[in-house]
């Protein structure tokens, strides 16, 4: 999902100007320069790829969470345990993006040494776009899997299949694997019909939601983002299938990794593909599989069969050239936060 229904005016901005503004806002809430730079770049990259729900629209939310002491912008991740391929990383109550970056870098090194690595990531704030970390694994010829859960006490966002109120978080999954000549194949999805971030982004943009995405607090279907905010719930993706995936992630997040202290807990699995097939043989086989998919005649209403991750790459090229569209209402909220923090805004 990359568009909202009924969105109004947009402001077109360069990636550089958005990154500088984001870095300024993050610095103003006590991020050190390295963390501010990394998180700002991560957010803008999400916007470039068309994943606007995980882009700069998150800045007001992050500021609000820091001011409420939900997480610490100065927190830094550390490896607290490493035992025979099983590693635990404590995010230090900081932003989740640096914790995930430490996890994937550690996981790649361990997978290259041992074939496989499993890493738990705990005690950190929002982790951003999970696909970014799976891309890092894929570039290093690894299969990377990430899933998160355990936060249902704080985030009862998704109704279980057959239920009428929110009981589970959106418990996202991401997978990344090399894909041949055109780059990696990346899957990154919430176990709900859409990510909760899309709802807040839609509200910020003054937009309505697609049908069959949320229910209101009484269990009735709705397209109004406010109905979700006022106690409604997202629906599980694919009905029982999305519910089952979410429930599994919830058990992993808490029963396996311990009670959540900040946001949610994560498990990352990294596998060195060279332990199974050489790089050239793998790439040729993957390319042949993807070529078969692309040759499939498109159904009515579609121009072509796409490979997961390719649309985002194309969007990034276009937005790098033409600028990133930010809904006017979202931009006003971001600039209001920046002004309150004394951060200059340039476009």
Regions flagged by a language model, labelled:
Residues 86-180:
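A generic, well-ordered mixed alpha/beta core segment in the N-terminal half of proteins
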Residues 54-108:
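Active-site cofactor/substrate anionic-group-binding motifs, chiefly glycine-
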Residues 2-21, 256, 260-347:
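Catalytic-core signal marking the mid-to-C-terminal active-site face
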Residues 2-14, 20-39, 44-45, 52-70, ...:
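Acidic, glycine/proline-rich low-complexity segments that act as flexible tails and inter-domain linkers
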């Amino acid at each position: 999902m990359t568009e909202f229904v009924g969105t109004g005016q947009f402001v077109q901005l360069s990636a550089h100007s958005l990154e500088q503004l984001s870095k300024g806002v993050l610095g103003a809430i006590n991020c050190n320069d390295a963390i501010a730079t990394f998180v700002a770049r991560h957010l803008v990259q999400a916007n470039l790829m068309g994943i606007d729900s995980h882009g700069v629209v998150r800045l007001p939310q992050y500021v609000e969470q820091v001011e409420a002491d939900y997480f610490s912008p100065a927190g830094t991740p550390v490896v607290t345990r490493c035992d025979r391929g099983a590693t635990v990383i404590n995010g230090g109550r900081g932003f989740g993006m640096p914790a995930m970056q430490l996890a994937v870098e550690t996981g790649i090194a361990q997978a290259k040494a041992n074939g496989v690595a499993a890493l738990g990531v705990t005690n950190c704030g929002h982790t951003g776009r999970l696909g970014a970390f799976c891309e890092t694994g894929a570039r290093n010829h690894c299969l990377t899997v990430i899933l998160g859960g355990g936060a249902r006490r704080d985030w009862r966002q998704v109704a279980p299949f057959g239920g009428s109120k929110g009981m589970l978080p959106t418990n996202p999954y991401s997978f990344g694997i090399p894909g041949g000549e055109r780059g990696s194949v990346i899957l990154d999805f919430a176990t709900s019909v859409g990510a909760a971030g899309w709802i807040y982004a839609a509200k910020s943009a003054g937009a309505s939601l697609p049908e069959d995405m949320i229910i209101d607090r009484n269990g009735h279907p709705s397209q109004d983002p406010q109905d979700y905010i006022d106690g409604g719930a997202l629906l599980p993706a694919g009905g029982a299938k999305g519910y089952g995936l979410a429930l599994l992630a919830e058990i992993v997040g808490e029963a396996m990794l311990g009670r959540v202290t900040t946001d949610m807990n994560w498990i990352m699995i990294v596998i060195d593909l060279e332990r199974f097939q050489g790089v050239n043989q793998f790439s040729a086989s993957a390319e042949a599989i993807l070529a078969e998919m692309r040759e499939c005649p498109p159904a009515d209403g579609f121009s072509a069969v796409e490979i997961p991750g390719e649309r985002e790459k194309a969007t990034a090229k276009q937005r790098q050239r033409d600028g990133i569209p930010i809904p006017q209402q979202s931009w006003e909220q971001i600039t209001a936060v920046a002004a309150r923090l004394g951060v200059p805004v340039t476009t």
